[in-house]
């Protein structure tokens, strides 16, 4: 239960002073590194300030986990053009842009990130609301499971495939 987990964590760890509501963070593998997403289900609806805070929280997490000095932060949207997105994402982008321009900022804001760009290595942290983030999480899990089953079926199809699988096993 996400809500119970979040409540328990807040009780033990407390909240950062400037954070309204914490988000659930997940790190996804990419071909060359990882991408950190926040929020993945704690806040189904949120305000622009919360969405911007998810970007900052994700940057802190990414810095601690991966040692990146200035993580590249983006907001998940339906396109990369500034005119895309919703009122929520456009307002959050404005807040993150201002925060990244501050002299003490420790992240770079890159703007919108499309779903197709989550795993291409151009972004380190993706901020999203919990509703959308949870859909991304469940979709990624489903795709990973489907691809695993398809590869497994192809590798066990016949004798030649099984030999190929045996040769490929150390790399997998």
What is the predicted function of each stretch?
Residues 7-10, 25, 52-59, 63, ...:
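Predominant activation on well-ordered alpha-helical scaffold segments within soluble catalytic domains
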Residues 1-15, 20-52, 63, 72, ...:
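N-terminal loops that bind phosphate or other acidic moieties
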Residues 35-37, 109, 127:
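Conserved beta-strand scaffold positions in the cores of enzyme catalytic domains, especially
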Residues 9-33, 122-126, 130-172:
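Glycine-rich phosphate/nucleotide-binding loop
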């Amino acid at each position: 239960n996400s809500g119970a987990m979040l409540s328990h964590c807040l009780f033990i760890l407390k909240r950062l002073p400037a954070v309204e509501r914490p988000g659930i963070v997940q790190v996804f593998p990419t071909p060359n590194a990882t991408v950190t997403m926040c929020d993945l289900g704690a806040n189904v609806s949120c305000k622009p300030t919360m969405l911007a805070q998810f970007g900052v929280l994700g940057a802190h997490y990414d810095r601690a986990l991966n040692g990146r000095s200035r993580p590249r932060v983006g907001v998940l949207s339906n396109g990369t053009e500034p005119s895309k997105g919703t009122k929520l994402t456009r307002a959050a982008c404005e807040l993150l842009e201002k925060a990244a321009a501050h002299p003490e900022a420790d992240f770079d804001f890159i703007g919108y990130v499309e779903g197709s760009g989550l795993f291409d290595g151009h972004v380190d942290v993706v901020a999203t609301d919990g509703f959308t983030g949870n859909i991304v999480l469940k979709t990624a899990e489903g795709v990973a499971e489907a691809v695993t089953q398809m590869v497994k079926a192809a590798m066990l199809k016949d004798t030649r495939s099984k030999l190929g699988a045996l040769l490929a096993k150390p790399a997998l």
